[in-house]
Structures are given as C-alpha cells and as structure tokens.
Swiss-Prot record:
GO biological process, one term: tryptophanyl-tRNA aminoacylation
Cellular component aspect of the GO annotation: cytoplasm
The keyword Transcription regulation is annotated on this UniProt entry: no
Organism: Pyrococcus furiosus (strain ATCC 43587 / DSM 3638 / JCM 8422 / Vc1)
Pfam families to which the protein is assigned, alphabetical: tRNA-synt_1b
Reactions accelerated catalytically: tRNA(Trp) + L-tryptophan + ATP = L-tryptophyl-tRNA(Trp) + AMP + diphosphate + H(+)
Family named by the database record: Belongs to the class-I aminoacyl-tRNA synthetase family.
Lineage of source species: Archaea, Methanobacteriati, Methanobacteriota, Thermococci, Thermococcales
InterPro entries named in the record: aa-tRNA-synth_I_CS, aa-tRNA-synth_Ic, Rossmann-like_a/b/a_fold, Trp-tRNA-ligase, Tryptophan-tRNA-ligase_arc
Enzyme class at the top of the EC tree: ligase
Motif 'KMSKS' region, residue numbers: 253-257
Protein name: Tryptophan--tRNA ligase
EC annotation from Swiss-Prot or TrEMBL: 6.1.1.2
Gene name per UniProt: trpS
Length: 385
C-alpha cells in the first residue's frame, strides 16, 4: 500500500510523491527543454537548484521565457511571513530568486507579511511579527540581491498596498477564498481579507509576474489567476521547489517550530554541527561490517539530500560520494563530518553578510531606486475601479 502524503499551505506530511503532486495541483513539470532554454537565454550554467531538479514544477514559466525573448520582460515576486527565525529551508528559494534576478536583470519585490502572521498566529503579538520582520529582512538581504532592483516592503508600513487590495478584494468572493484557505465561521475577518493583500504585488508592473516558491504555497496564487485578466493584467506565473527535508528524516519539511529538525541561519556554527551530528538521519547500515559489505542507501539519507540540494555544488564530487556510499567505501560518520564542515562554512559567511545587511535595510525598503519608484508611484488605473 502506498504511503499517503499531505501538502497544504499550512501542513506538509509524509514522503512526498512529487509527480503525483503535479497531478493533484494541476501544475506542469519543469522539463529539460525549459531548463535548457533558460540556460541559453541567460548564457549561463544553471545553478544546482535547477540542474538537480529541486525546482520541478511550474505555471506558465514557458510564457515568462516567451515574454523575455520578445523583449516584454517580466518581474519577480516572493515573500516571507515573519513568525520566527529563518532556517536553511526558508532561504534556499531566495538564492534561486537571486540567480533569476541577476541573470535576467529584472526587478524583484519581496513582501514581508507581518500583518498576516499576526492574524493567523494566535500566540504572536503585532510587535512580535514586526520584530521578526526586521530579523528576517537581514537574512534576506544577506543573500545578495541588487538593492536598486529589489524592493523589500513590510505590509504594516507600505499601506499603499491596502489601496491596491480593495479592488482585488471585490473580485474574490467568500466561497473562492474558503475553497483555498479553508476558512470557517471562527476565522477572523482580517484573515478572510488577506488573500487580496497577498495578490496585490502581482500587479506592481504591467508585465508577467514570476513567483519562485515551495509547491505548498501554490494555492495562494490560484485565486490571482482566476481574476487577473479581468483587470487587464497577466495571470501570475510560478516556479515550484520541493521541500528541504528536516534533519530527522525525509518526511515532511524542515520546521522552525521543531528545533531538532532545523538549522537556523543565526545558529552558532559549532552548535549547528552538534545538532547535525546528533539528529541527522543517515542511510547507513546498522553495523560498520554491514556498511562495508552491503553499502549505504543515499536515497534514504538526509545528509546526502542536504548535499544534493545545497551544500555540494560540484556535480562530479556529489556522484563520487553517492557511489562511494553505495559501494560501502564511505562511512556515515565521514559524510556527516563533511556536511558539518559545509554547513558551518555557509553559516559563518551568511552571518558576516547579515551583520553588514544592517546598513542596507533602509536602501532596500525606502531609498533604493526601485523602492523610491514604488513609494512615489500612483495606484494603477485598473486597480482604482
């Protein structure tokens, strides 16, 4: 009997069958042809997120590439709900987004939904979500986005978004929102209005919007695709990633609410190493003798999966490690030590950049070229109706 899995914007459980998920969500596979076309148009080698199919599904990405080829361009939009510290799983889609911004030379809008997290999380105050907004913004800036082509905006500050959301809210009836978000009679009225605010950035430019995000976030954009053309805009496009697995196994995704499953971006590198050593599940045999005789199972190993997704950029080295494990030449302890070294190097570098990001917050939010344009721009005519 096949194991069941569950993927919603709020829950991810079980071993995910990504091919089945494409069918369930009605998305399209990110094919080799599309990836080859991306490499050709950008004149670049694809990053590991695309080469190794961590991004595996899309909506209208082919049309995004058509628009780019025809000189129409496109823009990027992504975001973060600031409910606590960010971990490695949160930041990976931002690195993919940075590559897209850099190679296609396009604008990027990053929405920080401090209002949403206050409304949806009973245990958080508005002050909490504003605090985490600032902390999360530092991690996002540390990724290395172009400050003149990136606008990071916090919903509680960028109140113009409310003015844009009102005509959008007029396009979404309660049954549409309920079908996506599962609202009930107990749902707060602020929660019911929020989908309109989340859709607003897809109308920041009169071009097609591309959203790189994990597949569980896809339902948020289905609503926009239902009404965008009636406002004279494009249906938003999306690139979907798989989930970054928790330390404890390949089921579900890394969760900030379960500290033993996650490496936070602000973790002390030494403590992060201890956490990996203690909790990271491997695909090894019960004994050293059996490991040498039978070999390991990298397909079931979190350590190998982390290297594959993010921490081993060299394809040749990754495959050498894969076969050394399968042949019993590589022991789990050796692999863990290697991953610990790579994670610690990443954390040290990220935390240095995070410290420097403190001086860049104002530029990304207020004084950068794109930020100023957005603060000064009038509401688009179709959204005034």
């Amino acid at each position: 009997m096949e194991e069941e899995f569950k993927v919603t914007p709020w829950e991810v459980e079980g071993i995910i069958d990504y091919n089945k998920l494409i069918e369930q969500f009605g998305t399209s596979p990110l094919t080799d042809d599309l990836l080859e076309r991306t490499a050709r148009l950008t004149k670049s080698e694809l990053p590991i997120f695309f080469r190794r199919k961590f991004f595996f599904s899309h909506r209208d990405y082919d049309k995004v590439l058509d628009d780019y080829e025809q000189g129409k361009g496109f823009f990027l939009y992504t975001g973060r709900g600031p409910s606590g510290p960010m971990h490695i799983g949160h930041i990976i889609p931002f690195f993919a987004t940075k590559w897209l911004q850099e190679k296609f030379d396009v604008n990027l809008y990053i929405q920080i939904t401090d209002d949403e997290k206050f409304l949806f999380k009973e245990n958080l105050t508005f002050e909490d979500t504003k605090y985490w907004a600032y902390q999360n913004i530092l991690d996002i800036i540390a990724v290395g986005f172009d400050p003149d082509k990136t606008f990071i905006f916090q919903n509680s500050e960028f109140t113009k978004i409310y003015e844009m959301a009102i005509p959008i809210a007029k396009k979404i009836n309660f049954s549409m929102a309920k079908a996506v978000f599962g609202f009930t009679e107990q749902s707060k009225i602020g929660m019911i209005f929020f989908p309109a605010i989340q859709a607003a950035p897809t109308f920041f430019e009169k071009k097609r919007c591309l959203i790189p995000a994990a597949i569980d976030q896809d339902p948020y954009w289905r609503l926009q695709r239902d009404f965008a053309e009636s406002l004279g805009y494009y249906k938003t496009a999306a690139l979907h990633s798989k989930f970054f697995p928790p330390l404890t196994g390949l089921e579900g995704k890394m969760s900030a609410s379960k500290p033993e499953t996650a490496i936070y971006l602000t973790d002390n590198p030494e403590e992060a190493g201890k956490k990996i050593w203690k909790f990271a599940l491997t695909g090894g045999q019960p004994t050293l003798k059996e490991q040498r005789e039978k070999g390991g199972n990298p397909e079931k190993c979190v350590v190998f999966k982390w290297l594959e997704i993010f921490f081993e950029p060299d394809d040749k080295k990754l495959m050498e490690r894969y076969y050394a494990c399968k042949n019993g030449e590589l022991l789990c302890g050796e692999c863990k030590r290697y991953l610990i070294q790579r994670v610690q190097e990443f954390l040290k570098e990220h935390q240095e950049k995070r410290k420097k990001a403190e001086k860049l917050v104002e530029k990304f939010k207020y004084t950068g070229k794109l930020a100023q344009e957005q603060w000064n721009k009038a509401i688009p005519d179709p959204l005034k109706k």
